[in-house]
């Protein structure tokens, strides 16, 4: 895999607050190599490590995108939800930003069945078929459609398991991460000082609470994916 330059600067990371970890009482000792110091009761993340692993992650997603691989971005906490949706849409990736339904990947047959139902209901709504039903039946199906849109809207075009999963908050998305580990799907994980860096294939140490920090990491990854897609189209 060729190493590329992704213009990751310390200035922009500092400005986004990427270096601010959790309080020193709330930490995982496995994160020690990724912490540079303690300041006012807070662990400060080593941005040299952040730049290194973010660059590695960008190389990985560029390479995967240039070969037509499929991505899933997961981030369901309130602060990350909109950022995840916007990033995924920009990069033409699938995403989950509301709630991770247990077994979404490990029980793919059930997920596929739900997606099929979702697509059928969307088609019926667009063609006006739902409005031709008795009011009670139409109301039930519209509620079902709304529920499916909320939880599966970001993966409605997914036809198989993703090749790489990007996870915004390891603690919040632990179930999703475990499913990826079970299935052997490579993961890129944004990890704060209370996380376990050994669980993901590439762990990017960074503040997972600040919107600016999450946005910066996602923007770098999305740019790399978009560049990879462009390379794939040129060579197709």
UniProtKB/Swiss-Prot annotation:
Pfam families: Ribosomal_S2
CDD domains: RPS2
InterPro entries: Ribosomal_uS2, Ribosomal_uS2_bac/mit/plastid, Ribosomal_uS2_CS, Ribosomal_uS2_flav_dom_sf
GO BP field: translation
Ribosomal protein is among the record's keywords: yes
Sorted UniProt keywords: Chloroplast, Plastid, Ribonucleoprotein, Ribosomal protein
A GO molecular-function descriptor: structural constituent of ribosome
One GO cellular component term noted in the UniProt record for this chain: mitochondrial small ribosomal subunit
Family from the record: Belongs to the universal ribosomal protein uS2 family.
PANTHER family, alphabetized: 30S RIBOSOMAL PROTEIN S2 PROKARYOTIC AND ORGANELLAR (PTHR12534), SMALL RIBOSOMAL SUBUNIT PROTEIN US2M (PTHR12534:SF0)
Name used for this protein in its record: Small ribosomal subunit protein uS2c
């Amino acid at each position: 895999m060729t190493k590329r330059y992704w213009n990751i600067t310390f200035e922009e990371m500092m400005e986004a607050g990427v270096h601010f970890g959790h309080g020193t009482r709330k930490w995982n000792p496995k994160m020690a190599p990724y912490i540079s110091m303690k300041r006012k009761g807070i662990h400060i993340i080593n941005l040299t490590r952040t730049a290194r692993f973010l660059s590695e992650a960008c190389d990985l997603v560029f390479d995967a995108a240039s070969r037509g691989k499929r991505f899933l971005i997961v981030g369901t906490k309130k602060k990350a939800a909109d950022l995840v949706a916007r990033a995924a849409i920009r990069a033409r990736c699938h995403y989950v930003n509301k709630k991770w339904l247990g077994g979404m990947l490990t029980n793919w047959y059930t997920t596929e069945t739900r997606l099929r139902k979702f697509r059928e209901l969307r088609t019926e709504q667009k063609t006006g078929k739902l409005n031709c039903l008795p009011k009670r039946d139409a109301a039930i199906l519209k509620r079902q459609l709304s529920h499916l849109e909320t939880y599966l809207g970001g993966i409605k075009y997914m036809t198989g398991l993703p090749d790489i999963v990007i996870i915004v908050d390891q603690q919040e998305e632990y179930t999703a991460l475990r499913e990826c580990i079970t299935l052997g799907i490579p993961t890129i994980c944004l990890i704060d000082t209370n996380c376990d860096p050994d669980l993901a294939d590439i762990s990017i140490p960074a503040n997972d609470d600040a919107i600016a920090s999450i946005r910066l990491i996602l923007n770098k990854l999305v740019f790399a994916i978009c560049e990879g897609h462009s390379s794939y189209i040129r060579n197709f």
